[in-house]
């Protein structure tokens, strides 16, 4: 069946749904009914932009319609256009990956250059989800956890919460039930636990990240490479309910495995160890080993009761921090020894320098005193040679 043509009214309905949280909670039929009364009150000038956009959309659809030659093959120009779009998508993905790597390297190198690498703070995050849409990358979040980490202190703080999205994607109830029963075992909506206000939850997460990383900075979080798409989708799900968003609160999600690789190299550099044999394949393999699956007390109460510790978001968020501690343990000790030796050498150098300065000052004082005494002696000798004395009147 041929696709329906766009019209100005439906363009208005779609825009209203995108811009209003109330509209995003409505079905299409409910939104059409609600917008109908608004559309009736609009004059020709107000409707003009929407009618114009509809005409442009219809024209663009006609241009995109594939033309076939006599053999039923796609036109060469259209094939080249499709290949161009694929190349563009690949370039954007490559640029995004390079930007992630450069930013991660800059964070670690800046801390190293300021001699504060062991106090540099990183935030690790994890989500659990109820279900995923079949044809898109939309995930319905069920639980969120984050932890603040530094090499010196380890896990500094933890933020975790369950999420009640209110509803499951239509037709996905069975998938959500299967996912819950085989992983986290959390109750499904409408009986889900946790925060119901998605905008409030998103602001709470931003406040926690700002507290960890400081005001005026783009929030940067780290998660395992295979979870980056899911974490980004869950953040978008929470953000879309916030009508006050202006794009300034965007959270950047980076690869924690690349962070581990860079940390290993720079810590070895500070410790004076050879880092030529370190490669990302080795650090990735180590990261995927689970050393804490049977550690008690690191999951929430519900997951502990249901013996589902391994799938809880808090545990998923804490595991990277524990893994980094294990992997960098011996290297960190070497780095601390080097830093301690440097501090000892610096203290000894300062003490030696202080003694030299005191010695020079004492020598200068002695020379000044000797010079003064010599001057007085010479002055007295001059008076005696002339047969005069400063106290005798002739």
Swiss-Prot record:
Matches recorded under InterPro entries: HMG_box_dom_sf (IPR036910), Maelstrom (IPR024970), Protein_maelstrom (IPR039259)
SUPFAM superfamilies linked to this entry: HMG-box (SSF47095)
One function term, GO molecular function aspect: transcription cis-regulatory region binding
Subcellular location: Cytoplasm; Nucleus
GO biological process: germ-line stem cell population maintenance; male meiotic nuclear division; negative regulation of DNA-templated transcription; oogenesis; piRNA processing; regulation of miRNA-mediated gene silencing; regulatory ncRNA-mediated gene silencing; spermatogenesis
DNA-binding region, residues: 2-69
Family in the record: Belongs to the maelstrom family.
The protein, known as: Protein maelstrom
Species per Swiss-Prot/TrEMBL record: Drosophila sechellia
């Amino acid at each position: 069946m041929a696709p329906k043509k766009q019209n100005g009214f439906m363009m208005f309905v779609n825009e209203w749904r995108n811009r209003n949280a109330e509209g995003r909670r409505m079905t299409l039929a409910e939104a059409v009914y609600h917008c109908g009364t608004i559309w009736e009150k609009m004059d020709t000038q107000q409707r003009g932009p929407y009618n114009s956009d509809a005409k442009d959309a219809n024209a663009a659809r006609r241009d995109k319609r594939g033309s076939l030659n006599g053999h039923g093959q796609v036109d060469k120009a259209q094939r080249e256009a499709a290949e161009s779009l694929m190349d563009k998508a690949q370039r954007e993905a490559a640029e995004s990956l390079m930007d992630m790597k450069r930013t991660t390297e800059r964070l670690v190198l800046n801390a190293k250059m300021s001699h504060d690498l062991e106090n540099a703070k990183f935030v690790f995050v994890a989500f659990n989800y109820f279900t995923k849409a079949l044809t898109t990358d939309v995930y319905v979040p069920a639980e969120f956890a984050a932890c603040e980490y530094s090499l010196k202190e380890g896990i500094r703080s933890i933020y975790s919460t369950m999420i009640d999205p209110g509803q499951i994607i239509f037709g996905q109830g069975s998938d959500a039930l299967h996912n819950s029963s085989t992983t986290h075992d959390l109750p499904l909506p409408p009986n889900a636990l946790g925060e119901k206000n998605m905008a409030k939850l998103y602001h709470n997460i931003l406040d926690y990240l700002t507290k960890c990383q400081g005001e005026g900075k783009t929030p940067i979080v780290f998660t395992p490479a295979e979870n980056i798409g899911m974490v980004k989708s869950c953040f978008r799900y929470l953000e879309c309910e916030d009508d006050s968003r202006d794009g300034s609160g965007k959270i950047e999600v980076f690869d924690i495995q690349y962070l581990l690789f860079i940390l290993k190299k720079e810590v070895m550099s500070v410790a004076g160890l050879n880092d030529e044999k370190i490669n990302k394949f080795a650090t990735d393999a180590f990261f995927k080993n689970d050393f804490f699956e049977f550690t008690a007390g690191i999951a929430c109460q519900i997951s502990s009761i249901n013996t589902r510790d391994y799938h809880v978001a808090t545990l998923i968020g804490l595991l990277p921090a524990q893994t980094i501690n294990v992997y960098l343990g011996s290297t960190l000790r070497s780095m601390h020894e080097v830093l301690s030796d440097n501090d000892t050498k610096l203290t000894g150098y300062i003490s030696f320098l202080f003694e030299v300065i005191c010695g020079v000052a004492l020598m200068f004082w002695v020379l000044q005193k000797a010079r003064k005494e010599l001057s007085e002696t010479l002055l007295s000798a001059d008076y005696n040679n002339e047969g005069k004395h400063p106290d005798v009147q002739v």
